Design a protein with these regions (language model features):
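Beta-strand/loop-rich accessory regions of lumenal/periplasmic or secreted enzymes
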Residues: 2-188
Length: 188
């Protein structure tokens, strides 16, 4: 990704994936168990966590983007009645959020009761996520180190469908190499 100098900094640099609505179970190795952001993560701890998608939603009075998790090593989504899952990992630690609501829906609504669940599970995988700011009650300013700078961003990640309990252990221990050595390694 290349950010242009003439544009305001984006809130995130990454990708949005829309997954099957059946994938309501979430497991991750990263900071948790509660939502955390680059400038709001002192109370979050590195660990392996599990939750349902609905439980990752934070019901702020006015709906807004929420539920981010920083320093993630891997993320897995699966349904309750299957050992099949969708697995995500990356070369570098990443930020993620998983929601039954689209970003458009969160921005459109003024109250929680107005939210309509999406037909998909929305998965954001981010190489960079802006901080929240607001540590000064007069201004919602975000400190410079937590704002996306005009530079090139690189984000190498893997999305894989995994089936069966034996492959789950392999998936949980897999990390992408920093640089692919051959095509077989990338396909792994």
């Amino acid at each position: 990704f290349q950010l242009s100098r003439g544009l305001p900094p984006p809130a995130r640099v990454g990708v949005l994936l829309r997954c099957s609505k059946d994938l309501q179970q979430v497991k991750w190795l990263g900071l948790g168990p509660h939502e955390n952001y680059p400038d709001r993560k002192a109370s979050a701890f590195l660990g392996c966590y599990e939750a349902q998608v609905r439980d990752l939603h934070v019901p702020y009075i006015v709906p807004s983007e929420n539920g981010a998790h920083q320093e993630t090593r891997w993320l897995a989504l699966h349904s309750t009645d299957s050992t099949n899952m969708c697995f995500f990992t990356a070369v570098d630690n990443f930020s993620f959020s998983v929601s039954n609501f689209s970003a458009f829906e969160l921005a459109r609504c003024q109250h929680q009761h107005e939210l309509t669940p999406d037909e998909h599970v929305n998965v954001h995988l981010d190489a960079f996520h802006m901080g929240l700011g607001g540590d000064c009650s007069w201004f919602p300013c975000v400190h410079e180190e937590f704002v996306a700078s005009s530079r090139r961003y690189s984000f190498r990640f893997l999305v894989a469908g995994v089936s069966g309990a034996a492959q789950l252990l392999d998936a949980y221990s897999y990390r992408l190499p920093a640089e692919p050595t051959d095509a077989k390694e990338v396909e792994k």
